[in-house]
Amino acid sequence: MAKEDTLEFPGVVKELLPNATFRVELENGHEIIAHTAGKMRKNRIRVLAGDKVQVEMTPYDLTKGRINYRFK
């Protein structure tokens, strides 16, 4: 799949779940399950409840996503 096929949305982390997954509420009101991107894990960027994040999703499954940026 090409990178152009991803959808990006800003959101807020609502809950921490096991295995580095998070419940994220998007700006449009939808709640999804998201995991951290590999570069965020490698650089040990912490994501806590209440953080504003950028979530990337595929158009095929709009219930799961990947957190690729945490806003400061």
Swiss-Prot record:
One of its GO terms (molecular function) is rRNA binding. Signal peptide: none annotated. Pfam families: eIF-1a. Keywords: Cytoplasm, Initiation factor, Plasmid, Protein biosynthesis, RNA-binding, rRNA-binding. InterPro entries: NA-bd_OB-fold, RNA-binding_domain_S1_IF1, S1_domain, TIF_IF1. CDD domains: S1_IF1. The keyword rRNA-binding applies. GO terms for cellular component: cytosol. It is found in: Cytoplasm. PROSITE patterns: S1_IF1_TYPE. Residues 1-72 form the S1-like domain. HAMAP family: IF_1. One of the essential components for the initiation of protein synthesis. Stabilizes the binding of IF-2 and IF-3 on the 30S subunit to which N-formylmethionyl-tRNA(fMet) subsequently binds. Helps modulate mRNA selection, yielding the 30S pre-initiation complex (PIC). Upon addition of the 50S ribosomal subunit IF-1, IF-2 and IF-3 are released leaving the mature 70S translation initiation complex. Component of the 30S ribosomal translation pre-initiation complex which assembles on the 30S ribosome in the order IF-2 and IF-3, IF-1 and N-formylmethionyl-tRNA(fMet); mRNA recruitment can occur at any time during PIC assembly. Belongs to the IF-1 family. PANTHER family: TRANSLATION INITIATION FACTOR IF-1, CHLOROPLASTIC (PTHR33370:SF1). This is Translation initiation factor IF-1. The gene is infA.
